[in-house]
């Protein structure tokens, strides 16, 4: 199994000035990763298009493919028509950098006035947005996908329902095995639901504290149900990563596995440990 790393995993080094986005591909290669994901930053559209062309050249010269482009979105808050138009531009950027996949978000579940919207009311709008974007992206050779993250669209049954509603061959699931815990689900059980629809996968691990337990130090955040999680090196937390990978493989998944690290350890040290652990886990698969 080919293992990639998300540029998001280097956030710590980017924030403290050790790295910038153009350092991601060389550093990923140095650490032994086979590919990279590029997460959209705060660049303007014009700047991002220039950067995409630079990253494509860098990727080709290094022999480290850009396997996916990740962007935010909110069809409810930002409006369907405007968000579809913007995301079509993002699909063009994905094609410019040579990324065959693009993940974009759905919604945080609030309208432009900050009022909560139910999943049932939001679903038709979100599904229509994904359908229009993926139809456009298909013409560029870019497959689009939704990731289970962001609380509102994080639990397995909601994501499955969305994919079934969109019902397009160019659209599928970026299965993040750790993120199910943010919706208080058991990762192994949720991956069983997700695996048949997987077009991409994230390896992510978390430390866990139940609601009411003492939570020491920094780095912890609340799940939807009030439990606490902290990002972990793969194999150090409570996510059964080997079993999740077995389930994906049994369902016929043969795609990339990408590391998304968000712990408090030094990110370079952690990413070195992540790939060592994943090579060991996947060696017999």
Over which residues does each language-model region extend?
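Active-site mouth loops of central-metabolism enzymes
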Residues: 6-20, 72-84, 116-122, 233-235
